[in-house]
Swiss-Prot record:
Keyword Transcription regulation: yes
A GO term for molecular function: RNA polymerase II transcription regulatory region sequence-specific DNA binding
Family to which this protein belongs: Belongs to the krueppel C2H2-type zinc-finger protein family.
SMART domains, A to Z: KRAB, ZnF_C2H2
Region (Disordered): 91-167
Source species of the chain: Homo sapiens (Human)
Cellular component, GO annotation: nucleus
Free-text comment about domains: The KRAB domain and the zinc finger domain are both necessary for the regulation of NR3C1/GR transcriptional activity.
The KRAB domain, residue ranges: 26-97
Protein name: Zinc finger protein 764
Keyword hit for Nucleus: yes
Any Pfam family: KRAB
Length: 408
């Protein structure tokens, strides 16, 4: 039903002109917006709901200031419509759409709505309003979570089709998750939240096929294929596709580490690094190998381990062509070509190309090795054979004894 038309301006009972008011006085008729029947028919359901809420809120503000006056016919109409638009009510236009539309048509309609500039007024509902068995949740009750049935039936590529948009929700209309109890203002937000419980990823990238549980995550991912990097670091000039990635990168320059471990106090610059570090204390190994069943705490460790089964060596040396399973192994190998030795011994200062060689070399500095360290009369006086009570030398001692010699 269309709202009432704009009332005629009140007239002075003693004269022929309009009623006199104090300068600066404002009435509801001065700020209200009225639509004729034809204009009202052009509005979408969400726009109509927004109009009703704004008019009711405006009249409430004027009444609080004591200038509301008698209740206008428009407000009486809004209150009558509010009863019809309860949480269980359905838009008449939505009721006409009982069959699922083609996903391509839905995407075209969505683009058309964005061109009309109504994106800020509407919130898409990823579940078709006419889907059988779909009801708006009223109060928590036993049974499967809201939207669970529809999620299993949703198409695997693209966003589930839309028939029409629901009205803009009010503050008292909250949609609760029956799994964890969280509540949301938008029903579509609740449905996307339920995907986190089911593990379903219905939003697929048309370029690479990767799936996402949220439409916003897919939108951010698409920027990678478009090559967009709008967020640039002012320190080094490096650009990123997402603002959050730039924020994390800036901590490299500032040295900020806001995430601290409650068990050992170690601090990290990213929350994901802290989350993975916590597995060191909990002993959690959630990433098992599908071939041998061995579990790992980090997905990167699992990927490296899987290469021992497949024999894959994806990191070739550009100098000699030798391939390695890990990039760190290839980087250490390249030092044999460049002669770089970045790891010094803290006791004698001798430098090595690999950190493991430093650890093996430090065995000669062990306490109680016997003999006077240093060169005497042109020869090495340190005893290279283990003494009584010494720990066994590392394996590399027999293979590479030259790395255990001390510098004079």
């Amino acid at each position: 039903m269309a709202p009432p038309l704009a009332p005629l301006p009140p007239r002075d009972p003693n004269g022929a002109g309009p009623e006199w008011r104090e300068p600066g006085a404002v009435s509801f008729a001065d700020v209200a917006v009225y639509f004729c029947r034809e204009e009202w028919g052009c509005l979408r359901p969400a726009q109509r709901a927004l109009y009703r809420d704004v008019m009711r809120e405006t009249y409430g503000h004027l009444s609080a200031l004591g200038i509301g006056g008698n209740k206008p016919a428009l407000i009486s109409w809004v209150e009558e419509e509010a009863e019809l638009w309860g949480p269980a009510a359905q838009d008449p236009e939505v009721a006409k759409c009982q069959t699922q539309t083609d996903p391509a048509d839905s995407r075209n309609k969505k683009k058309e709505r964005q061109r009309e500039g109504t994106g800020a007024l509407e919130k898409p509902d990823p579940v078709a309003a006419g889907s059988p068995g779909l009801k708006s949740p009223q109060a928590p009750s036993a049974g499967p979570p809201y939207g669970w049935e529809q999620l299993s039936k949703a198409p695997h590529r693209g966003r589930p089709s839309l028939c029409a948009h629901p009205p803009v929700p009010r503050a008292d209309q909250r949609h609760g998750c029956y799994v964890c109890g969280k509540s949301f203002a938008w029903r579509s937000t609740l449905v996307e939240h339920v995907y986190s419980h089911t593990g379903e990823k219905p939003f697929h990238c048309t370029d690479c096929g990767k799936g996402f549980g949220h439409a916003s995550s897919l939108s951010k991912h698409r920027a990678i294929h478009r090559g967009e990097r709008p967020h640039r670091c002012l320190e080094c000039g490096r650009a990123f596709t997402q603002r959050s990635a730039l924020t994390s990168h800036l901590r490299v320059h500032t040295g900020e580490k806001p995430y601290g471990c409650a068990d050992c106090g170690r601090r990290f610059s990213q929350s994901s690094a802290l989350y993975q570090h916590r597995r060191v204390h909990s002993g959690e190994t959630p990433f098992p190998c599908p071939d041998c069943g061995r579990a790992f705490a980090y997905p990167s460790d699992l990927r490296r381990h899987v290469r021992t089964h497949t024999g894959e060596k994806p990191y070739p040396c550009p100098d000699c062509g030798r391939c390695f399973r890990q990039s760190s192994e290839m980087a250490a190998h390249r030092r044999t070509h460049s002669g770089e030795k970045p790891y010094p011994c803290p006791q004698c200062g001798r430098r090595f190309g690999q950190k493991s060689a430093v650890a093996k070399h430090q065995w000669v500095h062990r306490p109680g090795a016997g003999g006077h360290r240093g060169r005497v009369a042109g020869r090495l006086s340190v005893t290279l054979t283990p003494g009584h009570g010494d720990l066994d030398p590392p394996v590399g001692f027999q293979l590479y004894p030259e790395i255990f010699q001390e510098c004079g």
